Each structure stands twice: as C-alpha cells, then as structure tokens.
Amino acid sequence: MGAITSCHKFGFRKKEISYSAVYHHFFKWSHDNSLKNLWKNSILTIRDDLNFSELNLDGSHTLAKKGGESVAYQGRKKGKTCNILPITDAHGFIIASTGIIAGNHNDAYHLKPHLQTAFKEMKRMGLPIAGAYFNADMAFDTRDARKTCFNHGLIPNMTENKRNRKSTKRGRKRLFNDEVYKRRFCAERTFAWIDKYKRLLIRFERYDACFLGAHFIAFSMINLRHILNDKFK
C-alpha cells in the first residue's frame, strides 16, 4: 500500500519495486472494493474529529488523455473529461462521493440518485448527518436535489439558479444562509489537496474502477493527514 500511495502522489521514482507488481495489486484492490473500504475506515477513524453541522458538495472536471470509461468531450475544457463530486464536512474531510461522471453532462446530471446513494452510505456508517446544512453552488440547484436533502433530514443551502425562469418565483422565499454558504471554501481547499496527487490531475486510467480507486487513496490520505503528521513528528 505504501508503494501505491507513493506512486500516485509522486510518480515512480525508485526501481526497488516493480511497477507491474504495484499496478497488479492496485488494479485488484480497485475492483474488489478494498480501496473503497480503506477510505471508509479512514472516515470511521476520524469520526470524532468530523463536524456534521455543514456538508459541502462540489465537483471538478479532469482531462482524460487516453479516453476510457465515462469519458466525453467537454467544451469548456476543450477536451475529453470526466467528473467526480465529493462531499466534505465542515472541516474539509471527505466523507462521501459520487462515482465517475462523463464530462459531457452538466453537474446536476443524475444528481438525485447520486445524493440518495451518498446519504444512505453515510447513514449506514452511522454518521449523524440529519440537521446539517448542505452547501452547493447554483449548478446543483434543482427541485429533486432539494427534495432529496429534505427527505434525508438535511437543509439545502444552495444559491438559486434562475435558468429557465421568466418571472419571479411565487410563494415562500427559499431558505438560504449566506454566512453558512461562505464557509464552503473548505471544499476548494480539499480539491487543492487532491490536486497534489499527480495521477489525479490528468486521467490516464482507462477503467473507472481504477481512477476511482486512485481517488479513494487520496481521500484516505487527506482524511488521515493530521494523524499521520502527529505520528511521524
């Protein structure tokens, strides 16, 4: 595992371990959910440090140089991309994530089933997410997303997306807490940590399971970074 972690953060730099042996185990553990379980265990390890008062959703498109599964052309990036939507707590720890989404879809594509799966997984781990603010930008502001949040006991805190609306919305004004929304910057900080892992900046993995497995390693390292730093001081 140490060799795989070093490979994804720094690239191959030493010749002591065969790259084919490292990739063999990485491929195996990506497909049998071992890396996903590693990430889940990292969440349970830091459970007492998590802050569930606010959850933050955001996404980032990754250029895919060699194509592969769930890869499609994205005009804004001017290339083939894929997307992933992690969910962080108020401190920026990654506690849930969607799977890989093709880059030709907007951020709200199939958002309802993605959120339902993420919320159910967090509840299965015993994470007390009920009552939390759910921060997301206007790209995720859909009726289904808000309804899903309410159904799972969360408070949707999204800037209103006025697309396709020709007149002012009637009825009660939507709940929106601007002070809470401003604190979602921690999600951007988390993406900066993810970008430190070279294998995630540009996608070379053709299989979704492998690219997602690389993310699980990064998520685990980010969640445990303060524990590892204290251990090796």
PLM region descriptions:
Residues 1-233:
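Short alpha-helical elements
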